[in-house]
Amino acid sequence: MATKRTYQPSNLKRKRDHGFRARMKTADGRKILSRRRAKGRKVLSA
């Protein structure tokens, strides 16, 4: 029996886990966003 690939893409899970609203929910998530803003990232989150 072959092992399943670990990456099974789903846009819903992508947004829920890494989206902007998900980042804003936690203090650490907001830290991530502020770091990415400071770095000058064009895209802040998924």
UniProtKB/Swiss-Prot annotation:
Record-linked InterPro entries: Ribosomal_bL34 (IPR000271), Ribosomal_bL34_CS (IPR020939)
Any one GO molecular function term: structural constituent of ribosome
Region Disordered, annotated ranges: 1-46
Residue ranges with Basic residues bias: 12-24, 32-46
Pfam families (UniProt xref): Ribosomal_L34 (PF00468)
Swiss-Prot/TrEMBL keywords: Ribonucleoprotein, Ribosomal protein
UniProt superkingdom: Bacteria
Cellular component GO terms, alphabetical: ribonucleoprotein complex; ribosome
UniProt-listed HAMAP family: Ribosomal_bL34
Protein name: Large ribosomal subunit protein bL34
Lineage, uppermost ranks: Bacteria, Pseudomonadati, Pseudomonadota, Gammaproteobacteria, Lysobacterales
